[in-house]
Design a protein with these regions (language model features):
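Hydrophobic alpha-helical transmembrane segments
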Residues: 1-78, 82, 92-99, 106-248
Length: 248
């Protein structure tokens, strides 16, 4: 039973702040084994956030409902992907690859990082608020969350780890093609309840992932934990954008 539970618990612990390690002994190698479940974890976070938007939009302005949804997602994940986005955006202003990797290790956030963080949070809040007007935020949030976490898998599989030494992203260095394919299949299945909007959003997330893969290879020489987290966040936001456009 532990061989089944540990990978699932590892996926939850890797992507959220749920303290599953208190009850289940999670090991580093379990993260790669449970990576195909990343979309399911993302769906749970995105669906919960969207549900908050759907419910609170009944008595709050939609932008406020969307803001509460973003806050809940940040609380559940410890703002993990937002932090990664800020660090990656800050690194884009570096003079060379080595300096970029050094910036991503620094806990300080520069102007690029702050700008990226504010813009994405505001955009997410506006999009979830717009979806809540028609009570679609939960289903679309679920699909977008799954697509965003699925984006981690092909990047970690296809690109080398750019930073010497250990790091969170290196836990995914042992991913296999079957795990990646299974994770993508799970994300597609989770997009189906949202209909065309969910599938269009998943396609947008895939396109963003491809673009960021080329950018990461060119700028950083591969991926880091921050690059993976930033990709998950941007892919999720892209999925929300296209889903809203599809439903408009």
């Amino acid at each position: 039973m532990s061989a089944v539970l540990r990978p699932a618990a590892a996926a939850l612990a890797f992507l959220t702040r749920v303290p599953v390690a208190r009850w289940i002994d999670v090991r580093g190698e379990d993260v790669a084994r449970g990576a195909w479940l990343f979309p399911l974890v993302g769906a749970a976070v995105g669906g919960a956030a969207g549900l908050v938007a759907d419910v609170t939009a009944n008595w709050l302005p939609t932008i406020a409902a969307g803001g509460l949804a973003v806050a809940l997602a940040a609380l559940l994940t410890g703002a993990l992907h937002l932090d990664a986005l800020a660090d990656t955006a800050a690194a884009l202003g570096a003079r060379d690859r080595e300096h970029a990797l050094e910036i991503m290790r620094d806990h300080a956030i520069g102007a690029y990082g702050v700008t990226a963080l504010v813009l994405v949070c505001l955009l997410d809040a506006a999009l979830l608020g717009a979806l809540a007007e028609s009570n679609d935020a939960a289903l679309v949030g679920l699909a977008a969350g799954a697509a965003g976490r699925a984006a981690l898998l092909p990047l970690a599989f296809a690109l080398p780890y750019a930073r010497p030494g250990d790091g969170q992203g290196r836990l995914l260095s042992g991913l296999g093609a079957v795990t990646v394919a299974l994770g993508i299949a799970v994300a597609v299945l989770l997009a189906l309840p949202a209909g065309l909007a969910g599938l269009a959003g998943a396609a947008a997330a895939a396109l963003v992932t491809i673009v960021l893969a080329f950018a990461a290879r060119s700028r950083f020489g591969g991926v880091t934990g921050d690059v993976l987290g930033a990709t998950a966040k941007l892919a999720e936001t892209a999925a929300l954008v296209i889903a809203v456009a599809t439903l408009a």
